[in-house]
C-alpha cells in the first residue's frame, strides 16, 4: 500500500513478475502520514479468505517495523 504524496488516495499495487495491477482507493480518515508498506502475498491471500464480504472493513495500524491488520 502506498499513499502518493500529491494525491489524496490510497494506492495498492501488485505484481507477479510479469503483470502489474494498481488500484486507487479513497484515503480513510486518520490515514494522513501513513508510510508505504509492503504486504506479502500470503498475507493478502489470507485476508481475502477471511474477508469474504466485499463490504467488510478492516483496521490497519502501521509502525516503522510492523503492519497490523484487524
Swiss-Prot record:
GO-annotated biological processes: DNA strand elongation involved in DNA replication
Quaternary data: Forms a ring-shaped head-to-tail homodimer around DNA which binds and tethers DNA polymerases and other proteins to the DNA. The DNA replisome complex has a single clamp-loading complex (3 tau and 1 each of delta, delta', psi and chi subunits) which binds 3 Pol III cores (1 core on the leading strand and 2 on the lagging strand) each with a beta sliding clamp dimer. Additional proteins in the replisome are other copies of gamma, psi and chi, Ssb, DNA helicase and RNA primase.
Domain of life (superkingdom): Bacteria
Keyword Protein transport part of the UniProt annotation: no
Main location group: cytoplasm
Keywords: Cytoplasm, DNA replication, DNA-binding, DNA-directed DNA polymerase, Nucleotidyltransferase, Transferase
PANTHER family: BETA SLIDING CLAMP (PTHR30478:SF0), DNA POLYMERASE III SUBUNIT BETA (PTHR30478)
Organism in which the protein naturally occurs: Rhodobacter capsulatus
Molecular function GO labels: 3'-5' exonuclease activity; DNA binding; DNA-directed DNA polymerase activity
InterPro entries in the record: DNA_clamp_sf, DNA_polIII_beta, DNA_polIII_beta_cen
Primary role: Confers DNA tethering and processivity to DNA polymerases and other proteins. Acts as a clamp, forming a ring around DNA (a reaction catalyzed by the clamp-loading complex) which diffuses in an ATP-independent manner freely and bidirectionally along dsDNA. Initially characterized for its ability to contact the catalytic subunit of DNA polymerase III (Pol III), a complex, multichain enzyme responsible for most of the replicative synthesis in bacteria; Pol III exhibits 3'-5' exonuclease proofreading activity.
Protein name per the record: Beta sliding clamp
Subcellular location: Cytoplasm
Family: Belongs to the beta sliding clamp family.
Listed GO CC annotations: cytoplasm; DNA polymerase III complex
Amino acid at each position: 500500500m502506498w499513499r502518493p504524496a500529491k494525491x489524496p488516495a490510497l494506492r495498492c499495487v501488485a505484481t507477479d513478475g510479469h503483470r502489474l495491477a494498481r488500484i486507487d482507493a479513497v484515503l480513510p480518515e486518520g490515514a494522513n502520514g501513513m508510510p508505504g508498506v509492503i504486504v506479502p502475498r500470503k498475507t493478502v491471500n489470507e485476508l481475502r479468505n477471511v474477508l469474504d464480504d466485499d463490504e467488510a472493513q478492516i483496521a490497519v495500524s502501521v509502525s516503522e517495523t510492523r503492519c497490523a491488520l484487524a
